[in-house]
């Protein structure tokens, strides 16, 4: 979850009161093979993971469903009552007609619920066997799991397909090579990738929550400033700053002069379809539309390589630094003696920023051993896949591509890779607090307006999302699971 979706700025010129709406880019069909994770074609049937024979059938006609149901009933009865009961069961099931459909659906739901519980339990058993070096059991469980997972099934089946991919790679000690292959093999076209990210941006409020909460803290800190410099350590498509520029434009007394320094590497350049100049030109066009004095500076280097001289800090400018979904990519002391994670925070503190915003996934996978890391990943992404399932129909022809290109790589990397090759290294907010405190930061209080604004945003989504403020931070969760945390520092 690290690629930032792009907002089409032109959409805001004609709909100033609907700043959260995005316009989808057209999607070009692509049938290129995506290494171990194969993209979903625009026409059925769905394609599953190429490294295993997954059952990716998402539905059939009523007759086939009835026959499948009869077959499952026969199997259950045969096991429970013995072969003598089979003939009786055949006679009974053959008499089913349309009036029994409600009863059939009830049984089917029960069987599916049992299957889901079994799948989760089997995934855990497989990971546990691997952690105990029980290779025979692990291989046996993988064969069983291949018949249970599906990239077009229920949330746990879809997530299970990617978890299994990671388990297979971890067992084969090929996690690094698989993840590198995922990054080397042909991506979908830029417009397709942008479309997938747009869909994820729209169906889940995670990005919007992060951007709105960070922007609220920056707007509050800069409300009396006339010259504002914002350093964004992963600017991506620059979409976060659309609403902030508009908010500054409406500020009583006129907008400040805004300078944005955008940092990014070639990973996001592909998704943009070009370099950071695309972002700068787009934001400059928007700022001009709203009569906001604007300047953009680009820094095309990896975040871990950024030096103070790259940032162009000027006297007389109020400085804001934004860390949205980026710090978890920085290796810490458990990976490298350079400890870029803490070094970067100390460097930013030396710049004397007025406010620093942090948005991160609320997950604990950084230094965890393999088995607890697997459990944390399964529980975290199960909540995320369930939230997608509520908004994006399972028969949506781009849903599989959204999950594969925007989420699956992260899952595979966390499960399969070790050392420096594991770049997805999330920490809980408590650990981030410790790091910021050691770097010399103190908490910046949240604005009540931010809380109420995000609550209004969540009304457009499922009531299973929950917003909680505690200990000076905002948490966005799905049911009982925290997924994203946001806070500010000074």
UniProtKB/Swiss-Prot annotation:
<protein>
    <recommendedName>
        <fullName>Scarecrow-like transcription factor PAT1</fullName>
    </recommendedName>
</protein>
<dbReference type="GO" id="GO:0000976">
    <property type="term" value="F:transcription cis-regulatory region binding"/>
</dbReference>
<feature type="region of interest" description="Leucine repeat II (LRII)">
    <location>
        <begin position="278"/>
        <end position="310"/>
    </location>
</feature>
<feature type="region of interest" description="VHIID">
    <location>
        <begin position="197"/>
        <end position="262"/>
    </location>
</feature>
<feature type="domain" description="GRAS">
    <location>
        <begin position="110"/>
        <end position="490"/>
    </location>
</feature>
<keyword id="KW-0805">Transcription regulation</keyword>
<dbReference type="GO" id="GO:0009585">
    <property type="term" value="P:red, far-red light phototransduction"/>
</dbReference>
<comment type="similarity">
    <text>Belongs to the GRAS family.</text>
</comment>
<keyword id="KW-0963">Cytoplasm</keyword>
<keyword id="KW-0804">Transcription</keyword>
<feature type="region of interest" description="SAW">
    <location>
        <begin position="416"/>
        <end position="490"/>
    </location>
</feature>
<feature type="region of interest" description="PFYRE">
    <location>
        <begin position="319"/>
        <end position="413"/>
    </location>
</feature>
<feature type="region of interest" description="Leucine repeat I (LRI)">
    <location>
        <begin position="117"/>
        <end position="178"/>
    </location>
</feature>
<dbReference type="GO" id="GO:0009640">
    <property type="term" value="P:photomorphogenesis"/>
</dbReference>
<dbReference type="GO" id="GO:1990110">
    <property type="term" value="P:callus formation"/>
</dbReference>
<dbReference type="GO" id="GO:0005737">
    <property type="term" value="C:cytoplasm"/>
</dbReference>
<comment type="function">
    <text>Probable transcription factor involved in phytochrome A (phyA) signal transduction.</text>
</comment>
<feature type="short sequence motif" description="VHIID">
    <location>
        <begin position="228"/>
        <end position="232"/>
    </location>
</feature>
<dbReference type="InterPro" id="IPR005202">
    <property type="entry name" value="TF_GRAS"/>
</dbReference>
<dbReference type="GO" id="GO:0003700">
    <property type="term" value="F:DNA-binding transcription factor activity"/>
</dbReference>
<dbReference type="Pfam" id="PF03514">
    <property type="entry name" value="GRAS"/>
</dbReference>
């Amino acid at each position: 979850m690290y690629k930032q979706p792009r907002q089409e700025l032109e959409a805001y010129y004609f709909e100033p009161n609907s700043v959260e709406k995005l316009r989808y880019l057209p999607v070009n069909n692509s049938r290129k093979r995506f290494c171990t994770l194969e993209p979903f074609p625009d026409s059925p049937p769905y394609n599953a993971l190429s490294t295993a024979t997954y059952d990716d059938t998402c539905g059939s006609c009523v007759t086939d469903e009835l026959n499948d149901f009869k077959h499952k009933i026969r199997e259950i009865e045969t096991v429970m009552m013995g072969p003598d009961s089979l003939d009786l069961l055949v006679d009974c099931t053959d008499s089913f007609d349309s009036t029994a459909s409600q009863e059939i659906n009830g049984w089917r739901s029960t069987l599916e619920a049992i299957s889901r519980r079994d799948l989760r339990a089997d995934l855990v058993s497989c990971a546990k066997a691997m952690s105990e070096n029980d290779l025979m059991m692990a291989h046996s469980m993988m064969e069983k799991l291949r018949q249970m997972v599906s990239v077009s099934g229920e949330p746990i089946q879809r997530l299970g397909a990617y978890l299994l991919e990671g388990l297979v790679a971890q067992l084969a000690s090929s996690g690094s090579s698989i993840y590198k292959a995922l990054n080397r093999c042909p991506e979908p076209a830029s417009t397709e990738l942008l479309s997938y990210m747009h869909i994820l941006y729209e169906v889940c409020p995670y990005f919007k929550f992060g951007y709105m909460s960070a922007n609220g803290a920056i707007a509050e800190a800069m409300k009396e400033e006339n010259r504002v410099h914002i350093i964004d350590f992963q600017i991506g498509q620059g979409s976060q700053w659309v609403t902030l520029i508009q908010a500054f434009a409406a500020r009583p007394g006129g907008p400040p002069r805004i300078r944005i320094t955008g940092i990014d590497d070639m990973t996001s350049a592909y998704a943009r379809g070009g370099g950071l100049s695309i972002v700068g030109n787009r934001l400059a066009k928007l700022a001009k539309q709203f009569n906001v004095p604007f300047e953009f500076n680009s820094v095309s280097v990896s975040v871990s390589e950024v030096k103070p001289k790259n940032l162009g800090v000027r006297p007389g400018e109020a400085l804001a630094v934004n860390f949205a979904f980026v710090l978890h990519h920085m290796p810490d002391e458990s990976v490298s003696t350079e400890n870029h994670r803490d070094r970067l925070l100390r460097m930013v503190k030396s710049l004397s920023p007025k406010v620093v915003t942090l948005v991160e996934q609320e997950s604990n996978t950084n230094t965890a051993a393999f088995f607890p890391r697997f459990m944390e990943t399964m529980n975290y992404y199960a909540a995320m896949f369930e939230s997608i399932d509520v908004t994006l129909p399972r028969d949506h022809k781009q849903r599989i591509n959204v999950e594969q290109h925007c989420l699956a790589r992260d899952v595979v990397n966390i499960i399969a890779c070790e050392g420096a090759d594991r770049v997805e290294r999330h920490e809980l907010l408590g650990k981030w607090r410790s790091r910021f405190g050691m770097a010399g930061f103190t908490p910046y209080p949240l604005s009540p307006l931010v809380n109420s604004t995000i609550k209004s945003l969540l009304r457009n989504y499922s009531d299973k999302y929950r917003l909680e403020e505690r200990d000076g931070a905002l948490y966005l969760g799905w049911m009982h699971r925290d997924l994203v945390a946001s806070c500010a520092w000074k």
